[in-house]
């Protein structure tokens, strides 16, 4: 596959405690690495994919560096303990962007995701900017053409921008247009939105598209009455769920390593309360973690937070 590369073994290294007990294992010891892109030949039902791209962030006038996110997050995951669920993970490599050719990278990711999904592998994608979401989401739509797919975005931003070209600010507008083209419903929920970070034009577009929104303040002050009903609605109404997590939904004190750190944000402990029921309900088909930018990390703090989130998702995923 063009733009695809196998993950170097050097990224999956860690402390070996196996002399203590046979089950004293870490992720670097249980993950399987694909040497070529052939998901139908690989074990496990969680396909880990990287999308090494921040061209969308550059186009959106953000701080670049997220292209190095997948490699850094793999290193952070490698030394974490391997428990129930983690032995289902197979590293299916990374899609990279060639220069400024985001559209080609989107197509490659879309095809890779659809190929994994069609052979029974759910996809866990490490970005990359939030442009990741168009390629990932489109691949899920392609794999399940006759089904209702609910898109849940944990994010400070709506990412419904009007623009002349694709960027990290346009993925859900692109997915809306893709749903229009496929004559299917666009079912989008955004949780953690900062009103201060989205113009009225974006709120108007969200209203036009009937986007379900839970603001960051509502997450913090009305979790049981605003967040839980939205999660229950998505689980009840849709055949498949696609969860995309923009790490800038976290407070800057927990996640400094993003293009646009959040002054308020939703704490990691609260985010996990949202993620757990989505992982355990049996309908979650795809997850990505995006916008991690190692250039702005502080003592590996952001990498550890993002890796814990990915680790927990794989552990809970049913």
Curated annotation (Swiss-Prot):
Binds 2 manganese ions per subunit. Transmembrane segments: none annotated. Its EC number is 3.5.3.8. It is an enzyme of class 3 (hydrolase). Mn(2+) 1 binds at residues 130, 155, 159, 246. Keywords: Histidine metabolism, Hydrolase, Manganese, Metal-binding. One of its GO terms (biological process) is L-histidine catabolic process to glutamate and formamide. Pathway: Amino-acid degradation; L-histidine degradation into L-glutamate; L-glutamate from N-formimidoyl-L-glutamate (hydrolase route): step 1/1. One of its GO terms (molecular function) is agmatinase activity. Its cofactor is Mn(2+). It comes from the Bacteria. It catalyses: N-formimidoyl-L-glutamate + H2O = formamide + L-glutamate. Pfam families: Arginase. Mn(2+) 2 binds at residues 155, 157, 246, 248. InterPro entries: HutG, Ureohydrolase, Ureohydrolase_dom_sf, Ureohydrolase_Mn_BS. Belongs to the arginase family. Catalyzes the conversion of N-formimidoyl-L-glutamate to L-glutamate and formamide. This is Formimidoylglutamase. The lineage of its organism: Bacteria, Pseudomonadati, Pseudomonadota, Gammaproteobacteria, Enterobacterales.
